[in-house]
Amino acid sequence: MRLIAVGRMKDRVERDLFQRYAERLSPRLDLVEVAEGRGAPAEIKRREGQALLSALPDRAFAVALDEGGRAHDSLAFARVLERWLGLSRPVCFLVGGAEGLDGPVLARADDTLSLGPMTWPHMLIRGLLAEQLYRARAIASGHPYHRAGRPA
């Protein structure tokens, strides 16, 4: 799996959060960072969108993280992720910058994902996504990490 995201993680806490889960995942979650755009907001969005699409492998199954994307509870997301991983295509998650994802990125996406209706900092999303991917894989494998729904 691959996370293709706009900008470089400079904050150690954000980087450590991402790495804590990304390194424990199987398949591993690799991070590809593309440059932040410059200029007016529309130009930034366009440039960042082009950079995201350029970093996306040709046959990839692209999942765009977007506030208008599909929201899942943890069990449903585990099922969806297993389906994506079974496609025999590289699964790539796309995270835009502060201006969001450009239209062509959303058009190229095979699916969309929302981590809820709140707006999250795009650097923090990396760690949140890595944790949710780890949780989904734990659910699928029967690992005790996910505790929701267990009897008290």
Swiss-Prot record:
Catalysed reaction, written as an equation: pseudouridine(1915) in 23S rRNA + S-adenosyl-L-methionine = N(3)-methylpseudouridine(1915) in 23S rRNA + S-adenosyl-L-homocysteine + H(+)
GO CC field: cytoplasm
Enzyme class: transferase
Family matches, as CDD domains: RlmH-like (cd18081)
Keyword S-adenosyl-L-methionine: yes
This protein's UniProt keywords: Cytoplasm, Methyltransferase, rRNA processing, S-adenosyl-L-methionine, Transferase
Positions bound to S-adenosyl-L-methionine: L65, G96, L115, G116, P117, M118, T119, W120
Name used for this protein in its record: Ribosomal RNA large subunit methyltransferase H
